[in-house]
């Protein structure tokens, strides 16, 4: 198969399999609709341009997430410079959630996707990256590859982030 045809087939595979997830990723990283569309297009452009460099050392899916998150990280890096460190939530200060509580009890009836994404948006960029990949059902090993963290660090962050998000849905936090 000629190189261009192979690249087109790989890109079609990426957009078929991950197109909606890339749109969700851009929506979490950018609230402004016009900038969100630009970010999504930038992700697709980087994916297309980078396909010739894909050496199949990992799955196409893992590689796609790595490229997408690198583009988003650069996008966020620009925004972070204008945001003070006091605006971020520190997951290391979170107490573990009550393990006896059911997910329904922990989150209550006020659980909404909008609230979840608002809480995720307040996380530090690396924590946001981990939780977004987790929410897209990416395995911990692949999250570790994409983020450069160890698998253990990924598991710890996921546990702490889940506890933090659960706290955000407690009745006193919702008011």
Where are the regions a protein language model picked out?
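Amphipathic alpha-helical segment used for protein-protein interaction
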Residues: 99-131, 136-145, 166
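Residue-level preference for hydrophobic side chains embedded in well-ordered alpha helices
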Residues: 14, 18-22, 43, 63-68, ...
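Structural recognition of an alpha-helix C-terminal capping motif at a helix-to-coil junction
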Residues: 38-45, 49, 58-70
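DNA-recognition helix of helix-turn-helix
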Residues: 73, 140-171
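A short, charge-rich alpha-helical start-of-domain segment used by transcription regulators
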Residues: 1-24, 34-37, 48
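C-terminal edge and immediately downstream basic/flexible tail or linker adjoining helix-turn-helix-like DNA-binding
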Residues: 2-5, 9-11, 84-89, 146, ...
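Arg/Lys-rich amphipathic alpha helix in sigma70-family domain 2
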Residues: 53-55, 66-87, 101, 109, ...
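Hydrophobic positions on the alpha-helical face of helix-turn-helix-like DNA-binding modules
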Residues: 43, 67, 130-131, 143-145, ...
């Amino acid at each position: 198969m000629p190189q261009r045809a192979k690249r087109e087939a790989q890109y079609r595979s990426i957009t078929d399999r991950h197109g909606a997830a890339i749109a969700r990723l851009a929506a979490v990283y950018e609230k402004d609709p016009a900038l969100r569309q630009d970010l999504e297009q930038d992700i697709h452009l980087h994916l297309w341009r980078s396909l010739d460099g894909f050496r199949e050392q990992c799955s196409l899916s893992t590689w796609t997430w790595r490229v997408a998150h690198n583009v988003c990280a650069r996008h966020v890096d620009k925004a972070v410079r204008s945001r003070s460190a006091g605006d971020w939530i520190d997951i290391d200060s979170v107490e573990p959630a009550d393990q006896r509580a059911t997910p329904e009890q922990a989150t209550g009836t006020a659980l909404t996707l909008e609230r979840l994404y608002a809480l995720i948006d307040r996380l530090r960029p690396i924590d946001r990256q981990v939780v977004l990949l987790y929410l897209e059902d990416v395995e911990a090993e692949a999250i570790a590859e994409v983020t450069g963290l160890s698998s253990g660090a990924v598991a710890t962050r996921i546990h702490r982030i889940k506890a933090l998000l659960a706290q955000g849905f407690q009745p006193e936090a919702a008011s």
